[in-house]
C-alpha cells in the first residue's frame, strides 16, 4: 500500500527523485498522468491495467465519460526511473500541476499523487470541511 508524504525539489530539466518507499511499490516503470485537484497521479503498471480496464467500460455515448477518458489518457506517459532514482516530468504535466520547484509526494493507497508544494499547502489549509467531517460523511459508505 502506498502511504506517507515526502518532499523533493525538481531540477531545471524537470527531473525529480521518487521517494525510495514509493520506488519499491511502483517498480522501475510506471504511468504518470494528469490527476484531479491540480496534481499528478502515478500508477504502477499493474494498477494502470486495472484503470484501463475500467475506462474501457465507460459508455461512449456519455459526453462526460468521453471527456474524462480523453483528459486522463491524453496526459498519460510511461516513466522509467533513472540510475539516480529520478523521473522526468514532462512540461505539460508540470504545467497542469503548477509544479515549478518544490513538490510533495503523497501515497494514496493504490496511487501516488505529486503536488506542487504551494498548491498542496493551499489545498490542505483551505479545505472547506475538516478531516472529521469528511470521515463522518464516509461513515455512510462503511469506511
From Swiss-Prot:
Its main location: cytoplasm. One of its GO terms (biological process) is negative regulation of DNA-templated transcription initiation. Residues 5-47, 76-119 form the SpoVT-AbrB domain. Keywords: Cytoplasm, DNA-binding, Repeat, Transcription, Transcription regulation. It is found in: Cytoplasm, Nucleoid. SUPFAM superfamilies: AbrB/MazE/MraZ-like (SSF89447). Signal peptide: none annotated. GO terms for cellular component: cytoplasm; nucleoid. InterPro entries: MraZ (IPR003444), MraZ_C (IPR035644), MraZ_dom (IPR020603), MraZ_N (IPR035642), MraZ_sf (IPR038619), SpoVT-AbrB_dom (IPR007159), SpoVT-AbrB_sf (IPR037914). GO terms for molecular function: DNA-binding transcription factor activity; transcription cis-regulatory region binding. Belongs to the MraZ family. Forms oligomers. This is Transcriptional regulator MraZ. It comes from Thermoanaerobacter sp. (strain X514). The gene is mraZ.
